[in-house]
Structure formats: structure tokens, C-alpha cells
């Protein structure tokens, strides 16, 4: 009977498909078991490899540094042997050498790698990270900026443009490095790229890390003139092709020869810009946009500072307000 033959064929096909499914499930279990046999270090390597195309070069470099230096008591442990006690012990050892932020970053990397290759193990890991320490930032005063500007202008011309771009425009060193003449037009600086070092230390051009990184920053006609000085080709680098590392080195050399000035990191010029915007009364959402942040969280968490002199003025105002109530009663 044709119907019977057809039914037998369907049954045979069903059995065959069932065998294939069982075999695939078995292979999946084998694969999961193999994943459990890799070490934490191997899991991190494979995690980086799987994400390499979408991670920024600086992030990859940071991951490689973590793998090489932090949580070393974990690196040769198989995922199948990993438990909360071992994990916490490795964290405790690192507390003597690294900041809470560094440890938190390392834990985040290990968690992500373990979750990718052994999610059931990750769900059983419970550790306590060291408490965050409130970070204090040095913010130079306007008087400091004026003094530094005048000295750089006369003695370190190579540093002049990076200094102005950071202190007056709020650019990151990597963005300064990528800036070319065609990024400046009609009173605007267009931020479209950054130059960073890859994990091998080679400078590469990349798109901004987030969509918010693409932005326009207003500049005065005089500033535009200064930035475009000695630029013969609009494709030419504004700062002579200096990398962020070279800018930092030049900045340190400047302070080495100006020992009467209080040293602060080049990145503090960006803090100065943010604080200046806050003191001018610019809304936080606009400051975030100018600085390339996707939200105001960073402004509130990091840049919500005022100049020490301005803070002193506010303290005096508060003290005077106390006198008012005492004098009227």
C-alpha cells in the first residue's frame, strides 16, 4: 500500500532526524564540557578574540594588561575548578597592589569571559569587590591656564595647539591627535575620529568610541586662525601628527623646565574646560554633548567640581547668610 510505504518512510525519516538531534545535543554537551576544561586565562583569550572586531584598540590593550598582571592566582585555574573562595582570594591578593577601580575592571573581564564559556559556573560565583574610593581631581585655575599659555606660546610652540584644544575646546588627547585641517570649518571643530595605540603599541585611526563622540565644538575666528596656522593642506594634521603619548611627554617636559608651576596631568585641562562650562551656567546636557558623553552621568560623577577660588566665594556667601539671621534677631 502506498500509504503504508509512505508512513514507513516518514517513520524512518523521523528516526533518522531524531538520531541527528541526539548526536547534536551530545556534541553540544561535549563542547560545554570542553569549555569547562579551559583555564581562566584561555577563556579571556578566547573572549578577546571573539570580540576583537567590535572592541576599541584601547579596550583590547587594557584587557591584555589585566590578563598579564591582575588576578594571577586565577589564570591557570580551570573553569570547572573555579569557585567563589578561589576568586575572592585572588581579589584579596590584588587589593595590596591595585586600586578598587582596577580590580573592578579585572573582575568585570573575568566575569564576562566565564559567562561566555561556562554560564552555569558564572551564576554560582559570588565575590565582594573593594569599596570604591572617592577620587579627587585637581582643576587648574584660570590664572594657572593664563600663565601656562603665555609660557608655552613663547617656549613650546609644538604644545600650543594641543594645549588650546584641551583647555578651550575640551578635546581628548586621542581626538587632538586625529584632528586635521578639514575638521575645522565655519567656526566649528568637527570631531570624527581618534588616534589610539593598539595592543601592540602601534597608532591607529578609529571612529569615536560612541555615537556621542561625533560632535561639533564652537570656536572663535581668532582660535580658528591659530589652529590653522602653518597648515598648507587641509588634510594635514593640526598638531603635526603628534600622538596622545607624545603630547603627554611634551607636557611633562614643559613642567620639568618650569619647576615653579604645580604639575598636573594634561587630561586635567579637560576638567578645566568642563568646570568652566559649569561656572558659565551652561546646562549639563549641553556640556555632555560638547565633551562627547552620551549622558550627564559623567558630568555629575566626575566633572561636578568648581574652581577652589569659586568654592571659597560660595563658602563666604553661606557664612554671610548666617550672619543675616543672627543680626536681625
Q: How should these model regions be labeled?
A:
Residues 100, 120-173, 177:
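Basic, Lys/Arg- and aromatic-enriched nucleic-acid-binding interface segment
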Residues 33, 199, 204-214, 221-223, ...:
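C-terminal secondary-structure termini that scaffold catalytic or DNA-interacting sites
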Residues 36-67, 94-97:
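Short, aromatic/basic-rich helix-turn unit that serves as a nucleic-acid recognition element
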Residues 1-13:
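Single conserved hydrophobic/aromatic residue that forms the stacking wall/gate
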Residues 80-127, 172-174:
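N-terminal DNA-binding recognition helix of tyrosine site-specific recombinases/integrases
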Residues 101, 164, 168, 174-175, ...:
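C-terminal catalytic core of tyrosine-transesterase DNA break-rejoin enzymes
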Residues 53, 57, 195, 224, ...:
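Catalytic-site neighborhood detector that most strongly recognizes the C-terminal catalytic loop/helix
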Residues 218-261, 273:
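Active-site/catalytic core of tyrosine-dependent DNA strand-transfer enzymes
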Amino acid at each position: 500500500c502506498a500509504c503504508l510505504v509512505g508512513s514507513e518512510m516518514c517513520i524512518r525519516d523521523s528516526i533518522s532526524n531524531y538520531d541527528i538531534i541526539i548526536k547534536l545535543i551530545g556534541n553540544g554537551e561535549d563542547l560545554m564540557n570542553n569549555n569547562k576544561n579551559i583555564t581562566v586565562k584561555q577563556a579571556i583569550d578566547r573572549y578577546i578574540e571573539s570580540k576583537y572586531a567590535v572592541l576599541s584598540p584601547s579596550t583590547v590593550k587594557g584587557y591584555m594588561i589585566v590578563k598579564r598582571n591582575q588576578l594571577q592566582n586565577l589564570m591557570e585555574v580551570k573553569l570547572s575548578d573555579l569557585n567563589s573562595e578561589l576568586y575572592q582570594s585572588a581579589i584579596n591578593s590584588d587589593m595590596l597592589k591595585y586600586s578598587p577601580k582596577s580590580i573592578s575592571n579585572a573582575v568585570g573581564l573575568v566575569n564576562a569571559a566565564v559567562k561566555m564559556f561556562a554560564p552555569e559556573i558564572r551564576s554560582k560565583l559570588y565575590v565582594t569587590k573593594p569599596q570604591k574610593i572617592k577620587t579627587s581631581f585637581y582643576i587648574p585655575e584660570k590664572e594657572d591656564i593664563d600663565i601656562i599659555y603665555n609660557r608655552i606660546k613663547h617656549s613650546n610652540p609644538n604644545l600650543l595647539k594641543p594645549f588650546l584644544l584641551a583647555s578651550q575646546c575640551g578635546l581628548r588627547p586621542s581626538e587632538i591627535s586625529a584632528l586635521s585641517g578639514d575638521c575645522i570649518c565655519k567656526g566649528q571643530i568637527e570631531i570624527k575620529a581618534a588616534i589610539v595605540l593598539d595592543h601592540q603599541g602601534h597608532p591607529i585611526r578609529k571612529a569615536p568610541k560612541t555615537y556621542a563622540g561625533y560632535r561639533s565644538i564652537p570656536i572663535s575666528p581668532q582660535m580658528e586662525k591659530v589652529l590653522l596656522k602653518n597648515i598648507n593642506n587641509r588634510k594635514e594634521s593640526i598638531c603635526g601628527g603628534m600622538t596622545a603619548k607624545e603630547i603627554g611627554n611634551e607636557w611633562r617636559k614643559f613642567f620639568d623646565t618650569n619647576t615653579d608651576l604645580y604639575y598636573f596631568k594634561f587630561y586635567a585641562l579637560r576638567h578645566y574646560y568642563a568646570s568652566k562650562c559649569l561656572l558659565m551656567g551652561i546646562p549639563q546636557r549641553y556640556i555632555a554633548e560638547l565633551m562627547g558623553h552620551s549622558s550627564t552621568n559623567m558630568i555629575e560623577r566626575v566633572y561636578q567640581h568648581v574652581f577652589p577660588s569659586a568654592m571659597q566665594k560660595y563658602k563666604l556667601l553661606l557664612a554671610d547668610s548666617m550672619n543675616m539671621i543672627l543680626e536681625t534677631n
